[in-house]
Amino acid sequence: MPDPKNPVPGSIPVDLMRPEDTTTRLAVSAFNGTADQALGHVRDYAVVVARQMIGTTEEGGNNRGPAIESMLVDAGGKPGMPWCLAFVQRCYQRGFAMCATASVLPQGLHVGHFAQRCLRALPSACSNRPTVGAIALHYPDGYDAPGHCGIVTGIHGAISLSTIEGNTNEAGGRDSTTGDGVWPKIRPLGYWTLFVDIGFLNAPGVA
């Protein structure tokens, strides 16, 4: 289990890192790992970033506020749109930046369409088996219906998962009008439709 302050052995502690810090990027890129190891470290950093963002909340209306709108714009959206996937994209984009690794994730803010793109472009990363750091996707009514997502932070047997999710409330709802934010959740395993773990891309023996 990675140390939450320093998930990559021998690297700079995450609380000292910033994506725009060139020195940090060079230090991380000096880590001599294989492609799948590098992507695994991106995933681990995404979990750290997600934990740091717990407590981020909407301000001034549903799906509004400086932090929320920044995530939406960075993910190609507009203020006022649902932002659970924008939160996941933010965590992973910071992970890619920290590891000086190009993003492999599809863009977009619609959960079902994102799942479709992952299944087409990243089939070896997609599974119905959860792993810590994986992107958890919920779209039980099909690819075109509204969905939800989060980042897996813990697995409790075959019963439930711990996640960190954006655009959720303390009752566990999604995209409500009651002041959503970034919160840790525990949900039944069956709630989730698909898991995407980029650490499995290019792993030995995986096409």
Locate each region found by the language model:
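N-terminal capping segments
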Residues: 2-98, 202-207
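Aromatic- and glycine-rich peptidoglycan recognition patches
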Residues: 2-18, 25-35, 142, 146-207
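...with weaker cross-activation on analogous glycine-rich loops/strands in unrelated enzymes
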Residues: 42, 47, 77, 98-173
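Generic preference for flexible, low-structure residues
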Residues: 62-66, 104, 177-180
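Helix N-terminus capping/helix-initiation residues
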Residues: 65, 109-112, 188
